[in-house]
Amino acid sequence: MFNLRNFDVIVVGAGHAGTEAAMASSRMGCKTLLLTQKISDLGALSCNPAIGGIGKSHLVKEIDALGGMMAKAIDYSGIQFRILNSSKGPAVRSTRAQADKILYHETVKKILKKQNNLLILEAEVKDLIFKNYSVVGVLTQNEINFYSRSVVLAAGTFLGGKIHIGLKSYSAGRIGDKSAIDLSVRLRELSLRVNRLKTGTPPRIDINTVNFNNLLIQNSDTPVPVFSFMGNVSHHPKQIPCYLTHTNEKTHEIIRKNLDKSPIYTGFLKGLGPRYCPSIEDKIVRFPDRKSHQVFLEPEGLSSIKVYPNGISTSLPIEVQEQIVASIKGLEKSKIIRPGYAIEYDFFDPKDLNLTLESKLIKGLFFAGQINGTTGYEEAASQGLLAGLNAALSSKNTEGWFPRRDQAYLGVLIDDLTTQGTEEPYRMFTSRAEYRLSLREDNADLRLTEIGRKLGLVNDSRWIRYNQKVLNIQTEMNRLKKNKISPISPDADILKKLYNISLIKEISMSELLKRPQIRYQDLQSLESFRTGIVDLEAIGQIENEIKYAGYIKRQSEEIERHLKNENTFLSSICDYNKIRGLSSEVVKKLNDYKPISIGQASRISGITPAAISILLIHLKKESYKHTL
């Protein structure tokens, strides 16, 4: 039974960050309270009806490998699945799924309701409760105190949220939901650095008024991909297509004529928006020579009448939005059933956070999601999981955990945020990861599931399946190394005839698989192949490990060199003013950031190689003193 006032961890906000945080904490055995304005909006897809994409899907796979629920939720609600960059190397291939918004929310709700140690309540938090520079609970609008050892703030766009449509604006966390004004005001009174960002969404269109004839159709890939390592294609609901249309010169002219009604271009809206998901107004202004822009028509669900026109996010007045939509092929007679809008909200400087996402200033207070300056469901969910597990560890007075840049995209994300900070909404891309060949989608479980098991995040069924996969991979890779093909065998003739491969000496199946034109299924047609495995996931892993073995080895060696700096810790340095030779600018930055290692210090803007050398010399001298 719960003591209804005392918990180990309290999570404020039940979007993608909040729900993953609450799940992680409760799975680790902590009594967890999840507070939300509306239980009916648990894990809601507030903007686009999709999960995954370039770089983002890697985060989803990592969440899954650590026992999180996003991959499972999209497997049970995805109505179109595709592999992006399928013609490129495995490092940048990314899964993307269209979601049925209602099914997604219902799946998240079902998972949360089955979770032990978790209580979900409807309440708006207006204040935090502090004791000796530590957070010890929250105060709700109806004056109820809830106490805990750790608090995770995952308030999304609700802190100081303001919606803009044309030159009109009003306070809201998202359309139809009120802003958390009191909590925003209270947090601004603390010594936390806060600023404003904005994001936007397109109008929603009645599917019954769209003319899909003559539009490019986009179906699911075959075979249909699966997100979760525990998933199966049978989990997917019915698959339906999306459609592609384009803006045109008429569309662009309508927008140009109405820029004086845009809150972005009239100065009403100050916050910076996402660089890689600009409004249609931004596209027209920034790319004046473009004759058209893509618009993907994405159904919001199997039973929904809403279509999400991906590519025309806008905050222009509703009457202008109607003109824009009517100018686009297939949408000439379409009816808008919800206007597009921009929303401006508070975010807190992530440089004020440790790599565990705990505040450097307030013990026990963790931040996750859009309030850290990120954009996207996947970025939010991955931060939520990390904040939740560390809030749980903190409540047990146990040292926190975070992945390194060479271990996970989540490691890249939190290192970028806490080391570099951000002035615009941060979106994950594969290009942000310097070790992306080692951080592929297919090996997320091999990188993280054992860690998740030690942390208490991975249940028995996932652990058993993971170990079976590892055994299958190891057994098959050893078999392929031992299985040889003779140059005088019938298989040699097949290789010459079908693949123009001439054998001059005996070759192993493993060596053969290294060749670019050979796939695992090609080996299965050879007489000497004998019995292989049928696990497609393991087969993909085997192919990638064998084909890219040389590149992976070189990257592993690079990681080893990199780890020397990551494992050279700076915790012994309390005041950088005392180190001779550092410039005043470097001293200020090091004292402000408080990097945990030489590696992290080297990634801070303005920290020069000369400064790193001085730090290394200082550490060597200090180490020598301690040996005397």
Swiss-Prot record:
It is found in: Cytoplasm. Its cofactor is FAD. GO terms for biological process: tRNA methylation; tRNA wobble uridine modification. FAD binds at G13, A14, G15, H16, A17, G18. InterPro entries: FAD/NAD-bd_sf, GIDA_C_N, MnmG, MnmG-rel, MnmG-rel_CS, MnmG_C, MnmG_C_subdom, MnmG_C_subdom_sf. NAD(+) binds at residues 273-287. Keywords: Cytoplasm, FAD, Flavoprotein, NAD, tRNA processing. SMART domains: GIDA_assoc_3. One of its GO terms (molecular function) is flavin adenine dinucleotide binding. GO terms for cellular component: cytosol. HAMAP family: MnmG_GidA (MF_00129). NAD-binding protein involved in the addition of a carboxymethylaminomethyl (cmnm) group at the wobble position (U34) of certain tRNAs, forming tRNA-cmnm(5)s(2)U34. Homodimer. Heterotetramer of two MnmE and two MnmG subunits. Belongs to the MnmG family. This is tRNA uridine 5-carboxymethylaminomethyl modification enzyme MnmG. The lineage of its organism: Bacteria, Pseudomonadati, Pseudomonadota, Gammaproteobacteria, Enterobacterales. The gene is mnmG.
